[in-house]
């Protein structure tokens, strides 16, 4: 009995230690190649056409994406389209660029807390016995979340999920997968494990796509799975069929409806029971999404320059396990983002509207980027590299994914800048300028910080 208690205590100790270690060091330690001569805005290089939409991937072999340790993709789901259930070995952060829909992120061990009588749903039945018993059969499932334009969605590694477009327009979702995260112990090649579907055979890049997306049931022995699920082998053969002409996103036979909390209840943050390791929430009750469209809730706001929403581990606590964060920015016509550098991670920028002139400078003083970026393009700003941007005449909007749960930046101009924090004598001697010039360098942006109005006007 004593030995059993000792082993139990040791096991719990190791479990807690592992959890703490993952929270503190959630990223791989092997060196990444961030030695390149050029950064530029990139468009997706691989397009997979499915029955219910398209899946586009940026080239993960590009140096800028290898430096950041991420793989980026964009999914477009047609109305009544279903993105088939799948999981991946690395955490994913998603931005809903357009449309609305439903998503369920299924966490192992969490209760099936939602149920509905099948007679309440419109379903195609193929068995007479099902028609006879339809009033007594219930469908149990985990929580289904509403998606809207502007949502940031966190999907943990290994968590199976599906997405359905119940709206009247295309649902467009842009996401990054952090293949350099500690939870991914395979390698830095992106993989997606599908529970249904398969890659269509048409297309020049079929082979590359087939190496990335797999139906996990297809290679199993049908008799073994039949016994495991306790269902006929014909059912298993249907599960194993990749239905290659349908692809990764399919059209639902009829409009689907699900039991879910009402819209207001879905916005509340449910609290789990207090655990001995100090965590106040469990994965079963954590929020997976938050919205960044509200002007009133912007973290940074300037009447003459724009606004920025930040989504970090404080706003979305699940991000402390994923060590990712995001920001949504809106820069007015000809306004600037202060030159700055990220102290805690790489930044992956996706342009959602407008255009901007972007400059990125490395530690050698080389301009790795001095280009105009446009809607639909993506580029990487490596950690500690200094960058700035000026919006075009039509403004500039972006979403930035960051490989850290606690983003921290160090601006060079403005109220909270490094220059403003220096004594005048340090500035005058560093740049060989007069005290008046040093004072202007420190103070001419007034109370502005990060977002700077065009022409130096104060907001």
From Swiss-Prot:
For this record, an example GO cellular component is: endosperm protein body
**Xref: Pfam families:** Cupin_1
Record keyword Nucleotidyltransferase present: no
Q: GO molecular-function annotation terms?
A: nutrient reservoir activity
Q: According to its UniProt entry, what is the function of this protein?
A: Seed storage protein.
- Describe the family membership recorded for this protein in Swiss-Prot or TrEMBL: Belongs to the 11S seed storage protein (globulins) family.
Q: What protein name does the entry list?
A: 11S globulin seed storage protein 2
């Amino acid at each position: 009995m004593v030995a059993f208690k000792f082993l139990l205590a040791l096991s719990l100790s190791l479990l807690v230690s592992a959890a703490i270690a993952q929270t503190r060091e959630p990223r791989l330690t092997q060196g990444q190649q961030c030695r390149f001569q050029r950064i530029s805005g990139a468009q997706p290089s691989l397009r997979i056409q499915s029955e219910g939409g398209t899946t586009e991937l940026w080239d993960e072999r590009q140096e800028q994406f290898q430096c950041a340790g991420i793989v980026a993709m964009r999914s477009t789901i047609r109305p009544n389209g279903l993105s088939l259930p799948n999981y991946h070995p690395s955490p994913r952060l998603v931005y809903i660029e357009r449309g609305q829909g439903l998503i369920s992120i299924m966490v192992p061990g969490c209760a099936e807390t939602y149920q509905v009588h099948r007679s309440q749903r419109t379903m195609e039945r193929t068995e007479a016995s099902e028609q006879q018993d339809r009033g007594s059969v219930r469908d149990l499932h985990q929580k289904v979340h509403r998606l809207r334009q502007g949502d940031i969605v966190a999907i943990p590694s290994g968590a199976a999920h599906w997405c359905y477009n119940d709206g009247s327009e295309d649902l467009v979702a842009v996401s990054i997968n952090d293949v350099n995260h500690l939870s991914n112990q395979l390698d830095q090649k992106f993989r997606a494990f599908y529970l249904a579907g398969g890659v269509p055979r048409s297309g020049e890049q079929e082979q590359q796509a087939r190496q990335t997306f797999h139906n996990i049931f297809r290679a199993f022995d049908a008799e073994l799975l039949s016994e495991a699920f306790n269902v006929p082998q014909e059912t298993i053969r249907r599960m194993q069929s990749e239905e290659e002409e349908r692809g990764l996103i399919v059209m639902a036979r009829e409009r689907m409806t699900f039991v879910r909390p009402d819209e207001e209840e879905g916005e509340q943050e449910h609290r789990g029971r207090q655990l001995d390791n100090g965590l106040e929430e469990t994965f079963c009750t954590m929020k997976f999404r938050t919205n960044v469209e509200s002007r009133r809730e912007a973290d940074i706001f300037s009447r003459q320059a724009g606004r920025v929403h930040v989504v970090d581990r404080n706003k979305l606590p699940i991000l402390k396990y994923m060590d990712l964060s995001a920001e949504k920015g809106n820069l007015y016509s000809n306004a600037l983002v202060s030159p700055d550098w990220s102290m805690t991670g790489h930044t992956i920028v996706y342009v959602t509207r407008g255009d901007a002139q972007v400059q990125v400078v490395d530690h050698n003083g080389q301009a790795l980027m001095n280009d105009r970026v446009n809607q639909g393009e993506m580029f990487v700003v490596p950690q500690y590299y200094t960058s700035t941007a000026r919006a075009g005449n039509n403004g500039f909007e972006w979403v930035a994914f960051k490989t850290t749960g606690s983003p921290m930046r160090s601006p060079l101009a403005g109220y909270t800048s490094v220059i403003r924090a220096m004594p005048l004598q340090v500035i005058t001697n560093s740049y060989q300028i007069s005290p008046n010039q040093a004072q202007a360098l420190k103070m001419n942006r007034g109370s502005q910080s990060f977002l700077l109005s065009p022409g130096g006007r104060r907001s």
